[in-house]
Curated annotation (Swiss-Prot):
Organism whose genome encodes this protein: Streptococcus thermophilus (strain ATCC BAA-491 / LMD-9)
Name recorded for this polypeptide: Adapter protein MecA
GO molecular function terms noted in the UniProt entry: protein-macromolecule adaptor activity
Domain notes per entry: The N-terminal domain probably binds unfolded/aggregated proteins; the C-terminal domain interacts with ClpC.
Encoding gene (name): mecA
Pfam families referenced in this protein's UniProt entry, alphabetically: MecA
Family statement: Belongs to the MecA family.
Residues forming coiled coils: none
Length: 249
């Protein structure tokens, strides 16, 4: 485990999957308010050398963000003299087994306002490069450059009518790896952006993968820039791997 102080009131604790396993924890344990989760946080706090201003500081709130190979826990202190508040993790009732609905509820509660904003590097670099091409190149040169960029990367926006369809999509693509993925909600519709790296693949790879995606998803009627501006982002990176790795009941 590693700890980094972000500000006077916020710590970031990075917990590897090996750390979780050693403590008998799973990713889904963070999605419900239960005694096991509370005990784990007390244990982590005992094991780490907390800054002095976090010791006996009153109420602490926790926000959990799953990553591809770890869990990031953001610890925020307040001046209220109360016990640890674990309600920030979720407001769901106890359940037996993780259902898609419960997982989605936890995502909406915990992730859409998270403060650890890390750019979705590959997609952002792709968009930035295309923008620079637009602004600096003549039309013939621009066409050649854009074609070269698209040969290396392509991205798709997929739509899902409900969260069950998202789960089916992730389960149906268990063995598929992508360069990047984001997960959004807009109204009652869910969206996922998928970035594919094409440089080492045959010419037909992109079309084959898109056809495979559409076996489980729908063609989106929104672009990624539109979703970035208007939709709620539930996972801003590694959305597909996280959903693939989750065990559904």
């Amino acid at each position: 485990m590693e700890m980094k102080q972000i500000s006077e009131t916020t710590l970031k604790i990075m917990i590897t999957m090996e750390d979780l396993e050693e403590h008998g924890m799973e990713l889904k344990d963070f999605l419900i308010p239960q005694e096991k989760t509370e005990e784990f946080f007390y244990t982590v706090m005992d094991e780490l050398d907390l800054p002095d201003n976090f010791k006996n500081s009153g109420m602490l709130s926790f926000r959990v963000t799953p990553r591809k190979d770890r869990v990031d826990v953001f610890v925020t202190k307040s001046d209220l003299k109360e016990d640890l508040d674990f309600n920030d993790l979720s407001d769901m009732e106890d359940y037996s087994g993780l259902s898609p609905e419960e997982f989605l509820k936890a995502l909406e509660d915990n992730f859409m306002d998270k403060g650890d904003i890390e750019a979705h590097h590959k997609l952002e670099e792709h968009d930035k490069t295309l923008k620079e091409v637009d602004e600096t190149m003549t039309e013939p040169a621009k066409e050649v450059a854009e074609e070269t960029i698209r040969e290396d990367y392509t991205h798709y926006v997929l739509a899902f009518s409900d969260f069950d369809q998202v789960v089916t999509f992730a389960q149906g693509l268990k063995n598929v790896s992508v360069e990047g993925s984001e997960f959004y909600k807009l109204g009652d519709v869910y969206y996922m952006t998928i970035l594919l790296y094409l440089a080492d693949e045959p010419d037909y790879y992109a079309n084959n993968m898109y056809a495979r995606f559409l076996e489980y998803a729908n063609v989106a009627d929104r672009t990624r820039p539109y979703l970035q501006e208007h939709a709620t982002i539930l996972m801003e990176e590694d959305a597909l791997p996280v959903l693939q790795a989750t065990k559904w009941s």
